[in-house]
Amino acid sequence: AQAGDMQIELIEPTGEQANIYRDTVPEGKTAFHHLCYWTDDLDGEIASLVSQGYELAATGTVAGSGATFAYVDTSPVLGHMTELLTYSDDIKGLFDMVAAASINWDGNDPKRQLG
C-alpha cells in the first residue's frame, strides 16, 4: 500500500516457525510492527542502537536487490521494531513500482503478489 510518499507494508506471517514478525505481534493479532529507515551505514546504525541497549533481531539481504537490512528491537521504548535498509537501485526500483501501482488503484484486489 502507499499513502503519498509513504509505503505501508501489510505483512501476514504464515507457517508455524518463529520469525521477527511474531516476536512482537502474537499469532492471530493485528498490530503495528516496524518503521523502516534508509541508511548508508548499516553497521554503524546497528552498533549505535545496540550500544543504547537495543537487541539486534535479524539481518539479511533483500533477494535480488543487493540491499541489506537489519531489524532492531526498539519495541520496549518505541512500541515497534526498527528496520534499517541500505539503498540500492534495485530496491529503489521495487519501491517505485509499488508507488506507481498505487496511483490509480481503485480499491479492488488489495492482496497482490509481487514479481
Where are each of the predicted segments found?
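Glyoxalase I/VOC metalloenzyme domain signal
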Residues: Q2-E55, G66, D73-G115
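A short beta-turn/loop motif at secondary-structure boundaries
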Residues: V62-G64
